[in-house]
Amino acid sequence: MVTILDRINPDAKRVRHPEKAHRPDTEVLRKPDWIRVKAPTSKGYAETRSIVKEHKLVTVCEEAGCPNIGECWEKKHATFMIMGEICTRACAFCNVATGKPNALDMAEPENIAKAVKEMGLSHVVITSVDRDDLADGGAEHFEKVIWAIRAASPMTTIEILTPDFLKKPGALERVVAAKPDVFNHNMETVPGNYLTVRPGARYFHSVRLLQRVKELDPTMFTKSGIMVGLGEERNEVLQLMDDLRTADVDFLTIGQYLQPTRKHHQVMSFVTPEEFKSYETVAYTKGFLMVASSPLTRSSHHAGDDFARLRAAREKKILLAAE
């Protein structure tokens, strides 16, 4: 049996995933050559880690065990995770700890803004744990973080990756009103997998949330991502693309699911680079402005460069429509 301990405070010996303790161990498949990455050792990585720790911040890069952390942190790119490191959901794929969250850190918005300014970020990604325990799901905290970054670094573009705000009336409207540049909400997987992979969420609620963002602010870029290798069929992925285009989503990311521990959902397959390229081609034909599809693609990987390309793609589309 594997006991998963909290990495944030190892002295506490708190079980990191108590909801998964009863599950039988599953085999962790050997990764193919195309998905292996080097351990992070660069000077830039160390500097980014130092800034994160200095401001007592949490990053999804660390909490989710992202394979791209070495590359991103070397370039001083980081995705900040707000509202603590404990999530109220228990998704079968996720390495973020589950449990009863702590009270919100009221200094967090200012601390993030200081880190963004110190790192000289032209584009920042802010995500969060699910906070079903809060009346607004954390919408006000998102709002405060966006405002603080705008005040400290007016030229920095802001991308948010939000939870679904399920049963939190008015929460989405509040976050959209804060005017992030990109609103990202990940679908994570195809609808047939939701019961086992993402049991606390509702597929069509997430689709509707993305659609509602565009209704509230048609100029705001919307983005969503999925993992493959969870047992989905190709036609299910193509249908998900259609659902997202119906919601007028601009940007789709597709990446390989990697199993954090033996207690998490098993990797059912490693999708080849050629299959990822095929998904990208199909997605563009369906009308997405931007598509990132590769084994190591993650929601915030190359987010700054992708935002510039996304903006250019929209401008090109507008010019073509005017001809």
Swiss-Prot record:
<dbReference type="Pfam" id="PF04055">
    <property type="entry name" value="Radical_SAM"/>
</dbReference>
<keyword id="KW-0808">Transferase</keyword>
<keyword id="KW-0479">Metal-binding</keyword>
<feature type="binding site">
    <location>
        <position position="87"/>
    </location>
    <ligand>
        <name>[4Fe-4S] cluster 2</name>
    </ligand>
</feature>
<dbReference type="GO" id="GO:0005737">
    <property type="term" value="C:cytoplasm"/>
</dbReference>
<dbReference type="InterPro" id="IPR007197">
    <property type="entry name" value="rSAM"/>
</dbReference>
<keyword id="KW-0408">Iron</keyword>
<protein>
    <recommendedName>
        <fullName>Lipoyl synthase</fullName>
        <ecNumber>2.8.1.8</ecNumber>
    </recommendedName>
</protein>
<keyword id="KW-0963">Cytoplasm</keyword>
<feature type="binding site">
    <location>
        <position position="91"/>
    </location>
    <ligand>
        <name>[4Fe-4S] cluster 2</name>
    </ligand>
</feature>
<feature type="binding site">
    <location>
        <position position="72"/>
    </location>
    <ligand>
        <name>[4Fe-4S] cluster 1</name>
    </ligand>
</feature>
<comment type="pathway">
    <text>Protein modification; protein lipoylation via endogenous pathway; protein N(6)-(lipoyl)lysine from octanoyl-[acyl-carrier-protein]: step 2/2.</text>
</comment>
<dbReference type="InterPro" id="IPR013785">
    <property type="entry name" value="Aldolase_TIM"/>
</dbReference>
<dbReference type="Pfam" id="PF16881">
    <property type="entry name" value="LIAS_N"/>
</dbReference>
<dbReference type="InterPro" id="IPR003698">
    <property type="entry name" value="Lipoyl_synth"/>
</dbReference>
<dbReference type="GO" id="GO:0046872">
    <property type="term" value="F:metal ion binding"/>
</dbReference>
<feature type="binding site">
    <location>
        <position position="61"/>
    </location>
    <ligand>
        <name>[4Fe-4S] cluster 1</name>
    </ligand>
</feature>
<comment type="similarity">
    <text>Belongs to the radical SAM superfamily. Lipoyl synthase family.</text>
</comment>
<feature type="domain" description="Radical SAM core">
    <location>
        <begin position="73"/>
        <end position="289"/>
    </location>
</feature>
<feature type="binding site">
    <location>
        <position position="66"/>
    </location>
    <ligand>
        <name>[4Fe-4S] cluster 1</name>
    </ligand>
</feature>
<dbReference type="GO" id="GO:0016992">
    <property type="term" value="F:lipoate synthase activity"/>
</dbReference>
<keyword id="KW-0949">S-adenosyl-L-methionine</keyword>
<dbReference type="GO" id="GO:0051539">
    <property type="term" value="F:4 iron, 4 sulfur cluster binding"/>
</dbReference>
<dbReference type="InterPro" id="IPR031691">
    <property type="entry name" value="LIAS_N"/>
</dbReference>
<keyword id="KW-0411">Iron-sulfur</keyword>
<feature type="binding site">
    <location>
        <position position="94"/>
    </location>
    <ligand>
        <name>[4Fe-4S] cluster 2</name>
    </ligand>
</feature>
<keyword id="KW-0004">4Fe-4S</keyword>
<dbReference type="InterPro" id="IPR006638">
    <property type="entry name" value="Elp3/MiaA/NifB-like_rSAM"/>
</dbReference>
<feature type="binding site">
    <location>
        <position position="300"/>
    </location>
    <ligand>
        <name>[4Fe-4S] cluster 1</name>
    </ligand>
</feature>
